[in-house]
């Protein structure tokens, strides 16, 4: 396959998300991004090395992961969204009039200290403000067509999300998935192997697939279909589907054998959705089985199949059984392994940027 046909030099990351942490005193929050939520939560709570300086103060631990935004096509995309979420008052992804309105709302009752020509300081933000800002970002042109989904772990935060966002004028695309999967707040547990106090990571967060596990069955199916001796035809244009000259997509439905040229299926999906003015579709109907298919699902498999030689070797490598039955010890072992696997991907570039905390209801702000 020629270089011109390659969509990227590396496959789309297995997983990348932005997250919102809340401290145990429920007055401090932290927004970050990571390729592995379980490992990152352990870092913030001091169970493994790493984590932001701002979350390292013992008085604020344990931190709980209240929600995550998933589906980012690259680490740079996640970092872009992370910065915009942290700095909604300054990001250019939101129209200036909306930015100003949001900043004015947050500054109500507070003395303005910004002089003309000087960059506006980040206003203090409550949980409500952070959730409203998140809703704004998910609906703006820059991000609304990304394959993003929202998952909550804190039931009370999910309730606030529904309460505040239902009153907003902006709307989210219908295909975005918003779900609640409750997670326990991290609790201290004695680690007998090191005699240190570590925090258990909630099982629902540990169970998030972060290493292409959810693509394995799809890859196996695609290999069977594409390696078949029979001549394959595009499900859209009916012409031969030759992998040596074209990028070929395979339907992810297990019982369906339909393959299509990337350009043909893209045009079909865009036509179905009446979105010919855009470049990348969101979803569409398989020309074979007529199932509704997510475009991002097929592109992720294609990028892994064509550019993920090393990742595929790791994915199909036989796994050794874990010897330890101690959850705390297992957490530590997992953290070390994951740290080696994604150390270069886990971004901490925002650590030194201060994030204003929600003001205490007892003390008056100066």
Curated annotation (Swiss-Prot):
CDD domains attached to this UniProt entry: GIY-YIG_SLX1 (cd10455)
Coiled coil: none
GO MF, one example: 5'-flap endonuclease activity
Renumbered residue ranges of the record's region Disordered: 31-59, 102-124, 317-366
UniProt-listed Pfam families: GIY-YIG, SLX1_C
Subcellular location: Nucleus
The organism's place on the tree of life at top rank: Eukaryota
Root EC class: hydrolase
Domain GIY-YIG: 14-95
GO biological process, one term: double-strand break repair via homologous recombination
Ranges of compositional bias, category Basic residues: 109-123
Cofactor: a divalent metal cation
Keyword tags: DNA damage, DNA recombination, DNA repair, Endonuclease, Hydrolase, Metal-binding, Nuclease, Nucleus, Zinc, Zinc-finger
A GO CC term attached to the entry: Slx1-Slx4 complex
Entry EC no(s): 3.1.-.-
Ranges of compositional bias, category Acidic residues: 339-359
Zinc finger map (SLX1-type): 234-289
Family recorded in the similarity comment: Belongs to the SLX1 family.
PANTHER family documented for this protein: STRUCTURE-SPECIFIC ENDONUCLEASE SUBUNIT SLX1 (PTHR20208:SF10)
Record's subunit section: Forms a heterodimer with SLX4.
Function recorded in the entry: Catalytic subunit of the SLX1-SLX4 structure-specific endonuclease that resolves DNA secondary structures generated during DNA repair and recombination. Has endonuclease activity towards branched DNA substrates, introducing single-strand cuts in duplex DNA close to junctions with ss-DNA.
Name this polypeptide is given: Structure-specific endonuclease subunit SLX1
Gene source species: Phaeosphaeria nodorum (strain SN15 / ATCC MYA-4574 / FGSC 10173)
